């Protein structure tokens, strides 16, 4: 496989509307490549790509490849993701024509190889940390290329072809393909078993991330994560618990429902204080990683402090969609028990402290959760039951299959029953579908409630359903 693309090389993405694929497509368009793709979804991402001149076929058929071959003087490179099965007719036809077929990680690896780069890996916080790094670099006067798994607020996009020396990329561990990356600087936020459809167990995940770390010129990692502390020897550590013998530390001074104030240390010496306009210790950890990465790249701390004031979380990370009949509707991507726990803890702090980024102080927390994948729900059943108790009312949607077959006994009703056994006083309702879920939100929530919709599936449509 060639490691570089010439500007004239056409590139065709099968499934171009996905968050990872669309980011790469946007960058290649900006760099002058003829770009096409296919996607049956007519979502805002696809519409944006079409407005940028990308030809998007609405069906994934063999004829798509025929059309791309007919309209380009050179044969295209065909890009796929792990979600594309071998039986996809486009992919089969591309193979029949002996076209170059790259996994999206191959294309990202090629971009990483072309310039100095920062790649962010880890089980949780990748999108937020890579978004914060991108934002801090931009606010410091840099213009990085960015390939992120969410929309970066200051860019309004998940993909950006910058003119600066750095590339910032989110390194997804879900399929193990991040071992292909050779960044100038690697970041590992934390490690916890997930994606058990790919990994045999925690040791397999650790081994994969060790291979990623071994491919980085320099590596920074979270000292507060016990798995990282035991199994990794990075170039530098960061911490939110101690500053002694730690390269970068941010020790919290005050935690509120709408911000964190912390003191930043380098090699044990206090450098200065900063305020992060985001709540939660998990976000302070993400911001500390971002500060550490930028300092490793030589960005002055003073410039970073100014940039911190402009930080916003990426899309679907505690994303205030709006206020509906007095209820604050927030969307969050949390779909692992640790993410659910951290998000609910942050939301409860907003309720208890009376301080939040919401238009008015919330009085109650109504959690709306859509479990993602039957296998994940089964594996972390008890952990989900423990995490989801931390609210004033809980509304559950059916499990979002994400292409999986159902598993007998694994369902939202079973999860609700287990949560009731742990906390009998908690008001819990289970919806049969998203329409009924929307009705339950209308019936069970009150004005001044914080309605927090969590999940990686279709629960993010709640705001649109309420306002249609």
UniProtKB/Swiss-Prot annotation:
Q: Which reaction does it catalyse?
A: UDP-N-acetyl-alpha-D-muramate + L-alanine + ATP = UDP-N-acetyl-alpha-D-muramoyl-L-alanine + ADP + phosphate + H(+)
Listed GO cellular component terms?
cytoplasm
| Binding-site list for ATP | 122-128
Q: Which domain of life is it from?
A: Bacteria
- What EC number(s) would the UniProt record show? 6.3.2.8
List, in alphabetical order, the Gene Ontology terms for molecular function in this entry. Answer: ATP binding; UDP-N-acetylmuramate-L-alanine ligase activity
Listed under GO biological process in this entry are:
cell division; cell wall organization; peptidoglycan biosynthetic process; regulation of cell shape
Metabolic or biological pathway, per its Swiss-Prot or TrEMBL entry:
Cell wall biogenesis; peptidoglycan biosynthesis
SUPFAM superfamilies attached to this UniProt entry? MurCD N-terminal domain, MurD-like peptide ligases, catalytic domain, MurD-like peptide ligases, peptide-binding domain
Main localization is cytoplasm
Keyword check for Endoplasmic reticulum: no
Keywords, in A-Z order = ATP-binding, Cell cycle, Cell division, Cell shape, Cell wall biogenesis/degradation, Cytoplasm, Ligase, Nucleotide-binding, Peptidoglycan synthesis
- InterPro entries noted in UniProt: Mur-like_cat_sf (IPR036565), Mur_ligase_C (IPR004101), Mur_ligase_C_dom_sf (IPR036615), Mur_ligase_cen (IPR013221), Mur_ligase_N (IPR000713), MurCDEF_pg_biosynth (IPR050061), UDP-N-AcMur_Ala_ligase_MurC (IPR005758)
Q: Where in the cell is it found?
A: Cytoplasm
Role summary: Cell wall formation.
Which family does this protein fall into? Belongs to the MurCDEF family.
Q: What PANTHER family does the annotation carry?
A: UDP-N-ACETYLMURAMATE--L-ALANINE LIGASE, UDP-N-ACETYLMURAMATE--L-ALANINE LIGASE-RELATED
What NCBIfam families does UniProt report for this protein, alphabetically?
murC
Q: Which HAMAP family match?
A: MurC (MF_00046)
Under which name does UniProt file this protein? UDP-N-acetylmuramate--L-alanine ligase
